[in-house]
Amino acid sequence: MYKIKKSLKLFEEAKLHMPGGVNSPVRAFKNIDGNPIFFSKAKGPYVFDADDNKYIDYIGSWGPMILGHSNPNIIRAISKQLQLGTSYGAPTNLESKTAEIIKDCVPSIEKIRMVNSGTEATMSAIRLARGFTKRNKIIKFDGCYHGHVDSLLIKAGSGVSTFGLPDSPGIPKQLAKQTISCEFNNKDAFLETFENVKNDLAAVIIEPIAGNMGFIPGTKSFLNLLRKKTKENNSILIFDEVMTGFRVSLGGAQETVSYTHLRAHETN
């Protein structure tokens, strides 16, 4: 059994300065009835805590560390860029080069707006969908997490398809009612909800592989059904690939389900 004496001490100190001692609820370890472990360094597939215990890292910082920790090629690239400055508050050619690489990897992408978090990405996508369609309703799926977006922090009530109820204090009920949550991979639940709200349906948002409930993949037939119905209805289908992009495959989870009709060059 590992000893985490220093982690416990650091946790008590952190609680003096941060609510709950952490900056993200998932780091609190409350779901497993434990205390957070404080890490101090990482190398390759391993992370080391403040007590110098060594762990195999199966999380990878929730996705981005796919090349391992302290990868020498990454360290060199970061160090080289640091010599040129850290932030300009203005455009740089690196943005365009990065966008071009991303577009080459994910052919469904036509244009890119870069943001600092998954929450900003989903919030912007929802706002754009509502603005473009001039509709209000959003369909999401149980177990899919899309960040700290007010309209998406909801859970479903009883029944196969219900209007959302606020899942966190501070979210107005009227706002939550614009979001309907359906059971993941349940075609009947989706179709029932879709028929009820399609005239005011701006978008359907989904994690093609639901990370927060055990990495359950959406079935190909289910995901294709979402594409088919949203296209017919002129609603937007949003794939939240914050966790799956470039990891499940270079083209993201959407590449693994092989939808040619997700491609940007699709013709009717």
Task: List the model feature ranges, each with a label.
Residues 56-59, 205-209:
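Short beta-strands and strand-loop turn motifs
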Residues 100-202:
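PLP-dependent aspartate aminotransferase-fold enzymes
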